[in-house]
């Protein structure tokens, strides 16, 4: 499997780092990373890593200004792309087909080729413009996976919440996260079901 990972300047850089760390442990997945200029700034603000450290997690890292990179062409076959986190500027550009920079161009290629595009949009609160852009992209087949925490799995650390979001992103490609804690039903419902088998 070949996946493109785009990181933009929105907050939640730890999600992108954790995704790359998880994919690094999957020998059958080849990753192509592109970080926007502001993604690099956000990474260094929100994580203990440098942009160089994060780039090293991917099999290939591409210059965000390089519109001639291999991921900018549909003839380079991939299984899809994840933009994590996805800023509202990037999301709006993807919706409009405004391929400004390599993140936008790679997403545009994935869309035109009918491949899977997963966006992890990060903004709060959401304006009508944001919601309409997400709805339009959803109607095009783009998967919206906002980084919303779950509490049924009783997270004890920020990492637990991050792993849960990353696991839900990986689910979009049928990939299993080793730290995923999945819903098992309510305890009383499980007991009732077992008693009535």
Swiss-Prot record:
Its EC number is 2.5.1.129. FMN binds at residues 9-11, 36, 87-90, 122. The keyword Cytoplasm does not apply. Keywords: Flavoprotein, FMN, Prenyltransferase, Transferase. InterPro entries: Flavin_trans-like (IPR036551), Flavoprotein (IPR003382), UbiX-like (IPR004507), UbiX_pad_YclB (IPR032901). It is an enzyme of class 2 (transferase). It comes from the Bacteria. GO terms for molecular function: carboxy-lyase activity; flavin prenyltransferase activity. The keyword Transferase applies. It catalyses: dimethylallyl phosphate + FMNH2 = prenylated FMNH2 + phosphate. PANTHER family: FLAVIN PRENYLTRANSFERASE, FLAVIN PRENYLTRANSFERASE PAD1, MITOCHONDRIAL. Belongs to the UbiX/PAD1 family. YclB subfamily. Homododecamer. Flavin prenyltransferase that catalyzes the synthesis of the prenylated FMN cofactor (prenyl-FMN) for phenolic acid decarboxylase C. Involved in the decarboxylation and detoxification of phenolic derivatives under both aerobic and anaerobic conditions. This is Probable UbiX-like flavin prenyltransferase.
């Amino acid at each position: 499997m070949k996946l493109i990972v785009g990181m933009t300047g929105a907050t939640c850089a730890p999600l992108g780092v954790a995704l790359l760390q998880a994919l690094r442990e999957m020998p059958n997945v080849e990753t192509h990373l592109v970080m926007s200029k502001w993604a690099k700034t956000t990474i260094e603000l929100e994580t203990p890593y440098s942009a160089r450290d994060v780039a090293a997690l991917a099999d290939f890292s591409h210059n965000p200004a390089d519109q001639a990179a291999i991921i900018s062409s549909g003839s380079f076959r991939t299984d899809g792309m994840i933009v994590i986190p996805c800023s509202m500027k990037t999301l709006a550009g993807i919706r409009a087909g405004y391929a400004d920079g390599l993140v936008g161009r790679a997403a545009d290629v994935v869309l035109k080729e009918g491949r899977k595009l997963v966006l992890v949009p990060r903004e709060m609160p959401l304006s009508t413009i944001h919601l309409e852009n997400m709805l339009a992209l959803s109607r095009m087949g783009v998967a919206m996976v906002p980084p919303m925490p779950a509490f049924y799995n009783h997270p004890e650390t920020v990492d637990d919440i991050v792993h849960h979001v990353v696991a839900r992103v990986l689910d979009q490609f049928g990939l299993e996260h080793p730290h995923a804690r999945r819903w098992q039903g309510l305890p009383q419902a499980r007991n009732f079901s077992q008693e009535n088998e």
